[in-house]
Design a protein with these regions (language model features):
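Membrane-interface "cap" regions at the ends of multi-pass membrane proteins
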Residues: 1-54, 58-64, 77-81, 212, ...
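TM-loop-TM module centered on a large, flexible mid-protein loop between adjacent transmembrane helices
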Residues: 98-100, 105, 136-144, 258-323, ...
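Helix-loop-helix connectors at the membrane interface of multi-pass transporters/channels
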Residues: 98-101, 128-157, 191, 245-265, ...
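Extracellular loop-to-transmembrane helix junctions
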Residues: 48-149, 262-268, 272, 471-478
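A generic transmembrane alpha-helix motif of multi-pass inner-membrane proteins
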Residues: 380-390, 420-518
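Membrane-interface loop-to-helix entry segments
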Residues: 154-205, 259-264, 383-397, 421-432, ...
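Helix-loop-helix junctions that connect adjacent transmembrane segments
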Residues: 65-66, 142-156, 182-308, 457
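Membrane-helix boundary/coupling elements in multi-pass transport proteins
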Residues: 92, 115-130, 235, 239-248, ...
Length: 518
């Protein structure tokens, strides 16, 4: 009996902490620190981003593009430090939306949450569209020779099946997701690291000086910024550890650790994997002209059976990434709906008593993530649009945190704190984030093309829209839809819990958080 006391008291403490924010403990609190880290690391998933946009970096700067990796990792680590401190103060589902809610005006918070929600939904689309890049060659290696890896139709079918599967798994609960995540993270870390070492030891065709081989491309600020997009697509989503705070034990301590270690782990594992793939390129000229992705390079170096095993490991890692991103987006949608801030908030905020999951939110996120497949143009274009919106959300969040710091926040001590370094970290993170936003928005065929520049892959059917960079169109449309809803109905809604607790459950104290600092 005594052995269970710490667990019980810990659960009661976490539930009481959540009640202080005006929320009832409905989601099942079953994640430890490693599981929290695993979910955040799975969201980042170096293998997923590298498989999606490796060809973009290679065809822009050759092997030199690997130097974009530490630059982006450092910039994102500064953002992560900022987020880690805030997550220690506000351990509730919704990350950037919740932080801006407590530190800024209502309108600012709502639009930040709206943009971040659709950035997450687009990211779900992008990662399920990435899985076929590794899975189809792996299935072909197992004898499914009829699958055409170059067919957008085949890729689309595999992506939609993946979306359906991860939706069902998320409906059945965070504990199941955590078990799969924990296993998948170990596979990804060991698989990427071990296979990279094998590539460097036994298939080192280029030599380590490949990192200085630009393959004849001019190395300058413009080309370096364009080559950054693979790295930019990988290292984000670390705030997922905070998004799942209501399902994490002792989240004020666990979430900040998971946020930071997920970035560090992704930087190390992803960097080693990138180097291994680059040195294993049989012929740089052929790889550049053929826009090789990692699957092609792996198949060129290993026997069919060995390459198939490796691609299956990578496919598993990407699948876990899909699962994690879906889980994080569902929690954000749930957090906003619980506060009565979205259309159909009541059903979206309803938690199934037996599953402890918001079932309708899971379904809604899946349906919205499927919409881009109506005009499917490949994983790369969706990935760039999704990443640009994520960085916009992060930048909006960092602005609010900086404003709060200027007014004396934090005034209350939390387990993780930056102290006097907080303002310095925040300022540099804003400078980095702002420069990356300009980079995302800059119109260029490689990273923010107009539909007319996609070679027929994408057309909106409206002449002048096809001449506007894709990211601009996506942001404007999503912001416009949000503005129409907010000013027509949303702004008249209070931040209020819209689902009543079960009859036998105590009603938590309503109102603002006792430790809210403005």
């Amino acid at each position: 009996m005594s052995a269970s006391t710490p667990v019980s008291s810990g659960h009661e403490r976490d539930s009481a902490d959540l009640a202080g924010f005006g929320y009832q403990q409905e989601l099942k609190r079953s994640l430890g620190t490693f599981s929290s880290f695993a979910v955040a690391f799975s969201y980042i998933s170096p293998s997923t981003g590298i498989f999606t946009l490796f060809a973009l970096g290679l065809t822009t700067l050759g092997g030199v593009f690997i130097w974009t990796w530490p630059v982006v990792a450092l910039g994102q680590f500064l953002v992560a430090l900022n987020f880690a401190e805030v997550s220690s103060h506000y351990p509730v589902a919704g990350s950037v939306f919740q932080w801006t809610k407590y530190l800024s005006s209502r309108s600012y918070s709502w639009f930040t949450g709206w943009i971040y929600l659709f950035a997450g939904i687009l990211t779900v689309t992008a990662v399920v569209a990435t899985l076929p890049l590794a899975l189809i060659p792996a299935l072909n290696g197992l004898g499914w020779d009829s699958l055409d890896s170059g067919s957008l139709g085949t890729n689309e079918v595999v992506a939609l099946i993946t979306l359906a599967v991860i939706t069902v798994l998320n409906i059945y609960g965070v504990r199941l997701v955590a078990i799969i995540n924990n296993t998948g993270v170990l596979f990804e870390i060991l698989g990427m690291f071990v296979f990279a070492i094998v590539l460097m030891a036994f298939h080192n065709h280029q030599g380590f000086h490949v990192v200085t081989n630009s393959a004849g491309f001019h190395v300058g600020p413009s080309s370096f910024l364009a080559a950054m997009f693979m790295s930019l697509f990988v290292i984000y989503g670390f705030d997922t550890a905070s998004t799942l705070a209501e399902e994490t034990r002792d989240p004020r301590r666990a979430a900040p650790k998971a946020v930071l270690f997920s970035v560090i782990g992704a930087f190390i594992i992803g960097g080693v994997f990138l180097l291994g793939v680059l040195v294993a390129i049989p012929n740089m000229h052929t790889a550049v002209t053929g826009a090789f992705n990692p699957a092609t390079i792996i198949e060129a170096n290993f026997s069919s059976s060995f390459a198939t095993i490796y691609l299956l490991v990578v496919s598993a890692a990407i699948f876990v990434c899909c699962l994690s991103i879906m889980a994080a987006t569902i929690r954000l949608c749930f957090g906003m709906s619980r506060d009565n801030q979205l259309p159909f908030s009541k059903p979206l905020a309803k938690v199934a008593p037996s599953l402890h999951t918001p079932v309708w939110t899971c379904i809604a996120v899946a349906v919205l993530a499927a919409v881009p497949f109506l005009k499917y143009s490949g994983a790369g274009i969706i990935a760039i649009a999704a990443t640009g919106m994520i960085y916009l959300s992060y930048f909006l969040g960092n602005i609010v945190i900086m404003r709060a710091r200027a007014r004396g926040w934090p005034k209350i001590t939390a387990p993780f704190r930056l102290g006097r370094w907080g303002i310095v970290v925040n300022v540099v993170a804003l400078l980095y984030g702002g420069s990356m936003l300009i980079n995302f928005a800059w119109p260029r065929a490689a990273s923010n093309p107009k539909p007319a520049q996609t070679g027929g892959l994408l057309s909106f059917g409206i002449g002048f829209v096809n001449k506007i960079p894709i990211l601009w169109t996506v942001v404007v449309v999503i912001a416009a839809i949000g503005a129409i809803y907010y000013f027509a109905a949303g702004r008249r809604k209070d931040f209020a819990v819209v689902t009543a607790p079960a009859p036998d459950d105590p009603l938590p104290a309503a109102g603002p958080v006792p430790q809210v600092e403005n």
